[in-house]
Amino acid sequence: MPSSVRLRVFFLFAAGYFVSYVFRGVNLGFAPLITHDLGLSAADLGLLTSLYFIGFAIAQIPVGVLLDHYGPRRVTAGMLVFAAAGIWTFGASHGLGGLMVGRLLIGIGVSVCLSAAFKASAQHFPVARLPLVNGFTMAVGGLGGVVVGSPLASLLQTTTWRQVSIGLGVFTLVVAAAIALFAPRNADSHHQADVISQFKGTWHILKSGAFWKIASFSVVTQGVFYAMQSLWIRPYLLDVMNLTPAHAAALVSVLGFAMMLGCVGFGAAARGMERRGVSVYAFCGVGMALYVLVQVLMVLRVPLPPATLLAAYGVFGGTGILSYAVMAEYFPSHMIGRATTTLTLVIFLLIFGFQVGVGAVLSHWTPEGGHYPAVAHVTVWSILIALQLASAVWYVLPSRVLHKTRRTAS
């Protein structure tokens, strides 16, 4: 296959994932503005932002069926139209109800982007190159986490959040049109699939002891990381570290860059460590443990530069993504797709729960001048750290449920 076709596939579908990542974190910049304009509480803000993740989660199984039946080109282009409609609904709303509908539509609309990118890559790239290609796809998506930091903050100095919403909708339609027009048509699928079978497969995975052994630590750390990165890290920087809004926005971008480096770096290092006798399961566990350690250091307010702490938070925050590779080692090939889809589903449900929960806990304190007391944030972070430590115990305990699957040559 010509390299130009492969590059076209990569950039088109990576652009789709970039769009989904921007939508994931855009409320970081919007939050103080919509809170002021519409009088939202922290609980309202947490629920509103988390609807992206619940929309993403509930769409996973139907999206998997659509991808198998129609292929990534048509499904991605069509679903992104819903995302554009969602952000326009969001930007035009003058009450919490309209904002919630818009945010839910966005989550549903972009729910296909990452899975479609992985599927399109699998159709056009050699298997040996997929880990690297998928890592770069994650990195391009991570640029969205950079954009919602300083660039978005600067843009909001000269325009309104409603105008930015209109622009995001237009950009989303441009990406959708590019995928529809320029992605290869010959890779569209026509496999028969049904939602009932997918639900049965998901339920089978959820009853698996091996799944929960592998997923226990990663779903909690990933849930915490993305819940904080997409909303609550900025208030922490402002209220606890006493940073200026501009400094906080810059550190959000630092976190995004660090996460990109972490995803690519840990993905590349994992197989090298495995050749040295360190399993991907153990390597992933060490990375997640370091992520928890960074959170402890932040809560204790150790005298380190904020940029150093946020960079470490980003680098180690994404290491749980290695659990997808671990799943492939312990589930037979015909179950890997369902195992990874189920893992994504659980992670996004937890992100939803954590975002709502953080907002609910913060709302027990009365904000002063738009800021919550430091003790409120420390309480939230301490609870989240405790949950991660509890899940880590299950992850490291000896188990008889993990047995690597032997792959037979085909």
Regions found by a protein language model. Name each.
Residues 59-71, 263-278, 362:
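Helix-to-loop junctions at the C-terminal end of transmembrane segments
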Residues 39, 71, 92-98, 126, ...:
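Helix-breaking motifs and short loop linkers at transmembrane-helix boundaries and internal kinks
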